[in-house]
C-alpha cells in the first residue's frame, strides 16, 4: 500500500504540505520550525474505506454510513505531533 504524509499546522484546517516520504516531511517541519501534526494517509483510497477493508473500523450505527460521517472520518495510519519543529 502506498501512503502519503500530510502536515496540518497547529491552527490550520487544511494541509500546508503533502509528502511522499516521512523523512522529507520531517526535514521540512524541522527546517521551518513548525508546530502541528504530521499524519500518514493511504493513497488512492478514502480513509473510511481503508479502515473498513483492513478491519480497523466497522460501522455500528446508522449515522456512521452517512456522507457527513464518511467525509469527516480519519483513521490516520500513523501520526506525530511537533512543536517548533521538534517531534513530541
Residue ranges and their predicted role:
Residues 1-15, 24, 34, 41-44:
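Short aromatic-glycine-(Arg/Gly/Cys) micro-motifs in beta-strand/loop hairpins
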Residues 31-88:
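Short, mixed-charge low-complexity intrinsically disordered segments
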Residues 3, 9-13, 22, 53, ...:
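Generic preference for well-ordered secondary structure
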